[in-house]
C-alpha cells in the first residue's frame, strides 16, 4: 500500500505545473468535502451518544479560526478604518488566507531542507537510504494533510450541505490559491532534495506565488459578498441558488455598466 502510494506520488511529482495545479485543485475540493462530511458524521454520532467529543473540538477550532481572523482584522481596520466594513473583512480574509498559503509553502520546503541536512550528516549508505525513504514518506503525508485540511471540517461543521452553495463562488478561487501554494511547496521540496528529476527556476516559483496571491485576493473580495447573500437569503427565506444567481447577475451587470461609464 505504502509502495503503491509512493509510486502514484512520484508520478504526480513528474507532471508539469499546470497538470499538478489542476489535480491538486480537485484534491483540495475532495479533501474539503471529505473533512466536512467526517465532521458532520462525528457531530451526528456525538448527538446520539450524548457526548461532546466532536462539538467541543469544533468550538475550539472555530474559536482559533475566529481569533486568528480577528487579530488580522484588527490590524487591517487600523489601516483602512473600521467604518469600511467590506474592505476590512475582505483584506482580513486575504491576509489571513495568504499567510496560510505561505505556511504551506514553507512547511513543505522546510521538510526537504531539514532532511537534506540530515543526509549530509549521515555516514553510511544504509543510513542515507533510510533517511531518504523517510523524507519521501513524510512529504507525502504532509501533502495529504494540507490537501485534506481537517481543520476545515471542524470549522464548518454547523453548516448544512445545502449551505455549501455559499462557498462555491469564493471557494472556486480560494482552492486555486491553496492548490497553487501546495504545488509551490512541492516544487520547492523537490528542488531542495529531488525525488524526481525536474527543473524549476526561481522566476517560475515567484510567478506561482504571485498567482496564488491573485487567486486568494479575488476570493477575498468575493467572500464577504457570498456571506451577505447567504445571510440575506436565510433571513428572507429565499432559496440559496436563486439568491446567488440573482445576486451575481446584478453584480455582473453593475460592473459592466461601470466599465461602459468609464
Curated annotation (Swiss-Prot):
Keyword list (alphabetical) reads:
Cell membrane, Membrane, Transmembrane, Transmembrane helix
The cellular location(s) given in this protein's UniProt record come to: Cell membrane
**Membrane spanning residue stretches:** 21-41, 94-114, 139-159, 164-184, 205-225, 240-260
Membrane topology of the entry: Multi-pass membrane protein
The question of whether Transmembrane is a record keyword is answered with yes
Question: An example Gene Ontology cellular component term from the record?
Answer: plasma membrane
Q: Under which name does UniProt file this protein? A: Uncharacterized protein MJ0096
Amino acid at each position: 500500500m505504502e509502495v503503491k502510494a509512493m509510486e502514484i506520488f512520484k508520478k504526480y511529482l513528474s507532471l508539469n505545473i499546470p497538470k499538478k495545479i489542476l489535480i491538486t485543485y480537485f484534491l483540495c475540493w475532495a479533501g474539503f468535502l471529505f473533512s466536512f462530511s467526517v465532521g458532520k458524521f462525528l457531530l451526528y454520532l456525538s448527538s446520539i451518544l450524548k457526548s461532546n467529543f466532536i462539538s467541543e473540538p469544533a468550538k475550539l477550532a472555530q474559536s482559533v479560526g475566529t481569533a486568528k481572523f480577528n487579530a488580522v482584522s484588527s490590524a487591517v481596520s487600523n489601516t483602512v478604518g473600521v467604518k469600511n466594513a467590506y474592505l476590512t473583512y475582505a483584506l482580513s480574509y486575504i491576509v489571513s488566507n495568504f499567510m496560510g498559503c505561505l505556511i504551506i509553502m514553507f512547511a513543505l520546503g522546510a521538510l526537504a531542507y531539514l532532511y537534506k541536512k540530515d543526509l549530509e550528516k549521515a555516514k553510511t549508505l544504509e543510513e542515507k537510504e533510510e533517511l531518504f525513504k523517510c523524507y519521501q514518506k513524510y512529504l507525502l503525508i504532509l501533502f495529504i494533510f494540507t490537501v485534506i485540511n481537517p481543520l476545515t471540517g471542524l470549522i464548518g461543521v454547523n453548516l448544512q450541505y445545502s449551505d455549501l452553495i455559499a462557498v462555491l463562488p469564493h471557494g472556486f478561487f480560494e482552492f486555486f490559491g491553496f492548490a497553487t501554494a501546495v504545488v509551490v511547496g512541492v516544487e520547492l521540496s523537490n528542488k531542495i532534495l529531488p525525488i524526481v528529476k525536474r527543473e524549476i527556476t526561481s522566476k517560475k516559483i515567484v510567478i506561482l506565488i504571485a498567482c496564488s496571491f491573485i487567486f486568494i485576493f479575488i476570493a477575498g473580495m468575493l467572500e464577504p459578498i457570498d456571506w451577505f447573500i447567504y445571510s440575506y437569503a436565510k433571513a428572507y427565506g429565499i432559496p440559496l441558488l436563486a439568491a446567488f444567481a440573482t445576486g451575481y447577475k446584478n453584480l455582473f451587470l453593475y460592473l459592466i455598466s461601470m466599465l461602459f461609464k468609464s
